[in-house]
Amino acid sequence: GAKVPFFRSAATSNDYATTADVIAEVLDAYERIGMCFGTACCIYPTAPFVTANAIKTAMMLLEQEQADSVIPVVKFSFPPQRCVVIKDGRLTPKWPENMAKRSQDLEPLYHDCGQFYCLNVERFRKQKAIWMEHVVPFIQDEMNVQDIDTPEDWKIAEMKYKLLRGSEVRV
């Protein structure tokens, strides 16, 4: 098996620890063994389509833009401005003023892909956050993004993997 330099503490191994808490603890642990970094990248284990090239590109973007962090994002497949809520068993537009607008006329909105975060360590230490003042987007294609939280998510990831990697792949 792989050798690991340390394990996360109980405080950062629970359902309530933030990613920033985990990154800070990992950076502290590396510093205790004499390893200090100017930049860091936290990769989520539930992001199956992350590639070395994507991380390299995001890290280059971090440096080129002198950003605090680079966060992969993907455009919502349908405009959230036209979402509905269920109240008393009936559908109600969240923003009624957008219901008659064409979807292509609404501002494109993006969300965090939950894949990885590239950080300037010094600025991260000062702000203790991933979402800092100068965050640069790393825009991803929807086919390269699939968060896995449910069995259905897993099935969708398998289908995307097969489409991306070719028909010779058995899933």
What are these regions (language model features)?
Residues 28-32, 64, 126-130, 163-166:
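Secondary-structure boundary motif
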Residues 3-4, 134-136:
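Conserved beta-strand segments of alpha/beta enzyme cores
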Residues 1-39, 49-53, 57:
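Short phosphate-binding loop-to-helix
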Residues 16-21, 48-134, 140:
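Conserved core of the sugar-phosphate nucleotidyltransferase
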Residues 137-139, 144-171:
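Hydrophobic helical membrane-anchoring modules
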